[in-house]
Amino acid sequence: MHPEILSITLFGIVAAFTPGPNNFVAFYSGFNFGILRTLPHIIGVTLGFPFLLLCLALGLINIFKLYPLIQEVLKYLGTLFLIYLAYKISFSGPSDQENKNKNPIKFHETFIFQFLNPKGVIASIIIVSTYINPGETFVSYTTQIIIMALIVSVTSITLWTFLGKFSRKFATNHKFINYFNYAMSLLLLTSIITFYL
């Protein structure tokens, strides 16, 4: 076992459970669409984030170091996608019937977004550059970190989804749901600002 697995896990927990784009969207989706219809988002994050870590460990991090402009472009693409999501969330309808006719974020959108999510990319770069070294232990360390990322990702994103679903019980009228959607949209936009500070 990796001697620093505890510190990696603690860092992963902090990065995964604290508010950020993935969690805000999971909360919103759980609130508006329920657990089952949010499963594609849960699976997309659960598989996408560890896959991002794996890609970085296998060499993507070196490309970012050689060509920092690529990482900047990804950050701006992620920002545009988050603005689009915030718009979509802000103007989603309050009624259950309207939500039945709408679709929550899809698996492939969430999976691809992991490569555009500034919070996730920064956390992944920190994990890979700090804890994974090329050499004899590369495969062992990388495998342990990927397993940890899978466990932490599925746990955090599922928790945020359940929190959203639970919060729906307090939604007694359409106005509340509209305000909730506006608040989630604003939180998503605020999370973008923090990437540029």
PLM features per residue range, with description:
Residues 53-57, 116-128, 186-197:
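Hydrophobic alpha-helical transmembrane segments in multi-pass integral membrane proteins
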Residues 13, 17, 50-51, 87, ...:
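Hydrophobic/aromatic residues within the transmembrane alpha-helices of Major Facilitator Superfamily
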Residues 10, 39, 43-47, 51, ...:
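Hydrophobic residues within alpha-helical transmembrane segments
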Residues 107-115:
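A short amphipathic helical element positioned immediately N-terminal to and/or at the very start
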Residues 2-69, 126-145:
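Juxtamembrane transmembrane-helix termini in multi-pass membrane transport proteins
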Residues 22, 44, 48-60, 82-85, ...:
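Alpha-helical transmembrane segments and their lipid-water interface positions
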Residues 91-105:
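Flexible cytoplasmic inter-helical loops of multi-pass small-molecule transporters
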Residues 65-94, 150-156, 160-163, 168-197:
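Selective transmembrane alpha-helices of multi-pass membrane proteins
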